[in-house]
Amino acid sequence: MVHAQFDPTSREELAIAAVEAKIAKDLSWQQIADAAGYSPAFVTAAVLGQHPLPPRAADTVAGLLGLGDDAALLLQTIPTRGSIPAGVPTDPTIYRFYEMLQVYGTTLKALIHEQFGDGIISAINFKLDVRKVPDPDGGYRAVVTLDGKYLPTVPF
């Protein structure tokens, strides 16, 4: 049976324990995702409390991290999503995304609506990918792909 989790505290505590275990076992998110059989973005979000994992993946992740049966069950619950507290984020990495949306949010809205019409991009039917690519000018660039299904507004 599918269960919903309404108190984010237990998932937050599990996320802390999972990250501590990940560090202690010197595992990457990619290794955890490979074991679970899903993308690194999805598994990372799930372990950090933003998605439920399917039963087999939850058992695998909990086992790999040494978290036990209770953690495996908790990883399967539908969480209360939204890990950023109200207000402006203070973590520099998260803040840069906030800043990008402050600068380009209206541009994205205008371009999306021009191409698709009135509606939204789903964060449920959604894929996320992060890649590290060489920068021709030296160093590296982060390529972040947000791939969501377009859902048109339907008059009623």
Swiss-Prot record:
Molecular function per GO: cyanate hydratase activity; DNA binding
Catalysed reactions listed for this entry: cyanate + hydrogencarbonate + 3 H(+) = NH4(+) + 2 CO2
Pfam family, one: CYNS_N
UniProt GO BP: cyanate metabolic process
Enzyme class (EC, first level): lyase
Keyword flag Lyase: yes
Regions that span the bilayer: none
UniProtKB keywords: Lyase
Record EC number: 4.2.1.104
InterPro entries, alphabetized: Cyanase, Cyanate_lyase_C, Cyanate_lyase_C_sf, CYNS_N, Lambda_DNA-bd_dom_sf
UniProt feature coiled coil, ranges: none
SMART domains in alphabetical order: Cyanate_lyase (SM01116)
Active site, per annotation: 96, 99, 122
Family per record: Belongs to the cyanase family.
Stated role: Catalyzes the reaction of cyanate with bicarbonate to produce ammonia and carbon dioxide.
Protein known as: Cyanate hydratase
